[in-house]
């Protein structure tokens, strides 16, 4: 259910874009992201910080897109979100509180050097996605950008997550590997 809620705004954005335009899709994205927050709180009695930050960015950049009737704002939002993810990972690493380890460390007890490698891997991934988004958003058609945002970035993130799990599994202690099989 949680994963469905996470994809709800993206699916709504895509569907509304296909039937209307980028401005209707942006308005729908703002509403869907707000509904996501409310539903998440209703179901789980808490809202993750990242969801609040994402909503703030969607609401502000989406509103700017609608007020100025300029899709550049919503296109930049994607790159800014990826930049914030990368900055958060770097900050956590330098402050001695690796974010990936805090999220997955109990289930995947691997050495700190593995967590550090994964952190930098994800930082590079987020930076690459942000830069590629800029290229696609401002060099190719709007429709190409929407498809890239919805399918390309989602697929890249899923593949990256799978590669991360495989890498972590490879470095797990043998007893933990048996437990997970």
Swiss-Prot record:
Keywords: Cell inner membrane, Cell membrane, Membrane, Transmembrane, Transmembrane helix. Its main location: membrane. The chain crosses the membrane at residues 19-39, 50-70, 80-100, 118-138, 148-168. It is a multi-pass membrane protein. InterPro entries: YciB (IPR006008). It comes from the Bacteria. It is found in: Cell inner membrane. GO terms for cellular component: plasma membrane. Belongs to the YciB family. Plays a role in cell envelope biogenesis, maintenance of cell envelope integrity and membrane homeostasis. NCBIfam families: ispZ (TIGR00997), PRK00259.1-2 (NF001324), PRK00259.1-3 (NF001325). HAMAP family: YciB (MF_00189). This is Inner membrane-spanning protein YciB. It comes from Shewanella amazonensis (strain ATCC BAA-1098 / SB2B).
């Amino acid at each position: 259910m949680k994963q469905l809620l996470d994809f709800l705004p993206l699916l709504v954005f895509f569907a509304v874009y296909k039937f209307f335009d980028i401005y209707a899709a942006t308005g729908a994205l703002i509403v869907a992201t707000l509904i996501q927050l409310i539903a998440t709180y209703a179901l789980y009695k808490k809202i993750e910080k990242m969801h609040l930050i994402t909503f703030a960015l969607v609401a502000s950049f989406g509103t700017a897109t609608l007020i100025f009737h300029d899709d550049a704002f919503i296109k930049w939002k994607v790159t800014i979100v990826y930049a914030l993810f990368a900055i958060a990972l770097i900050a956590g690493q330098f402050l001695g509180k690796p974010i990936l380890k805090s999220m997955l460390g109990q289930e995947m007890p691997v050495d700190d050097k593995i967590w550090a490698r994964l952190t930098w891997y994800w930082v590079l991934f987020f930076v690459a996605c942000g830069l590629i988004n800029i290229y696609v958003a401002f060099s190719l058609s709007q429709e190409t950008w929407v498809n890239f945002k919805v399918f390309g970035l989602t697929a890249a993130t899923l593949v990256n997550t799978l590669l991360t799990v495989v890498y972590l599994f490879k470095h797990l202690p043998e007893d933990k590997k048996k437990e997970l099989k």
